[in-house]
């Protein structure tokens, strides 16, 4: 489980991240593709140093991909629980923060009604980092299927258009 501000200290590097983002745009690169590449390289590194980690470029069979996807889903589930807990203000400690999703806790209603914009900047940042943690594993799913940013955009565009059409037609 997450610990208070486990990732919040990373914000000290935000200037470097901002400069990197502007450099990526200045080089006319796609930020999503850069993130996919970064995640792929991390997974390759893990596969090279830990024999039990899958190499994303060596997923050859449907079974390999099923195993890869299940691992990513398990990780997403774990990170999602951390995200929910962080919405209960990690500055209170993990046990107290979990009241936001544990209906049997005395502080449940209070935690549920707390406005995000009234939380400390550190608590708000922890929430965002937990969502980014989930995004890592979503990126891994795309990487495992060998998808690039252009393909993701095209398929997303088509599916989003279809979803609007469905809504227009009483879906």
Curated annotation (Swiss-Prot):
SUPFAM superfamilies: all-alpha NTP pyrophosphatases
Keyword Iron-sulfur: no
Gene3D superfamilies: Type II deoxyuridine triphosphatase
Keyword Transferase assigned: no
Disulfide bond sites: none
Enzyme nomenclature, EC number: 3.6.1.12
Annotated protein name in UniProt: dCTP pyrophosphatase
Gene: 56
């Amino acid at each position: 489980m997450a610990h208070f501000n486990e990732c919040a200290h990373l914000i000290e590097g935000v200037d470097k991240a901002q400069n990197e983002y502007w450099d990526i745009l200045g080089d006319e690169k796609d930020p999503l593709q850069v993130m996919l590449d970064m995640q792929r390289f991390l997974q390759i590194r893990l596969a090279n140093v830990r024999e039990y980690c899958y190499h994303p470029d060596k997923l050859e069979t449907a079974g390999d991909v099923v195993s890869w996807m299940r691992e990513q889903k398990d990780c997403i589930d774990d990170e999602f629980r951390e995200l929910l807990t962080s919405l209960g203000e990690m500055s209170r400690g993990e046990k107290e923060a979990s009241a936001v999703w544990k209906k049997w806790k005395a502080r449940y209603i209070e935690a549920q009604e707390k406005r995000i914009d009234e939380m400390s900047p550190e608590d708000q940042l922890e929430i965002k980092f937990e969502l980014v943690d989930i995004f890592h594993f979503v990126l891994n799913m795309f990487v495992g299927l060998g998808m690039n940013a252009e393909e993701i955009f095209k398929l997303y565009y088509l599916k989003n258009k279809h979803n609007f059409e469905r809504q227009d037609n009483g879906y």
